[in-house]
């Protein structure tokens, strides 16, 4: 970019997204994967793995299992994953089961919920999100003193505050003209408006979303039940919390349909420490909650917990599905440079289990 940052973009590697260009898509995907495997020299002349663009490899019927038409391309993707921990994996099967369509996220993990135009055609490109307001779930849990009923009362209040933040963001755009960013609003990146047109016209017509995020589900469940959400009791509460969040946003959309609320599994890359500091300052040191220096990403299982990679995906997949605004699950492994076969087995499990994941 003009200020020297890596563009925060993703490349969608969905072979059958446009069937008439399938062969061309395969050639492009092959080249992207070969380039990622080769790596890029940094300023010191050392070959390194570039962070962006993110590569998103879509697993489908034609490339997941041995014998499928493009399995050779998946083997190349697995080689890239083994060496570069990229591409990420999107399951066409699971996404279609849940959303009816398969489509890419924006950047790393922010998905746009399905939106159809006046002709009932889904739109996935030329859309965007107006911003995210994230809720610190453990804060509500600690404020409740361990009373689950009180926790949900407090969570409801915080959701209402987040709704107001989203509404404010939308209203701040009222009266903003297309001339503020011609390449976006006048020249076709998003729309082709006249310079004096309000951008809200395009935002409404193209189904932009506003997002409420959440983080620290693990700490919340652990504080309220004393158990991880890998246990039956812990998971039942975790699932109930996720359903409550999703249903609350669905109710918001009934009364404010123009805002198109979506639930986002906040990654906590920049705010994890800040949220943790606020918890510790307010509630003191609480074992396994405020004593770590971080709170756990979205719905994820605690990174310190010993768990099989396949089981981790099994559990987290059930929680990921609530996050219509996007979320990603990770698994951590030992170096797999010489074990592409194991990567391929993980790919198969991801295809059958979870929408979006990475190694």
Question: Where are the regions that the model predicts?
Answer:
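Contiguous, well-ordered alpha-helical segments that form the cores/surfaces of helical PPI scaffolds
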Residues: 210-223, 243
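Conserved catalytic cores of very large enzyme subunits
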Residues: 1-206, 223, 227, 231-359
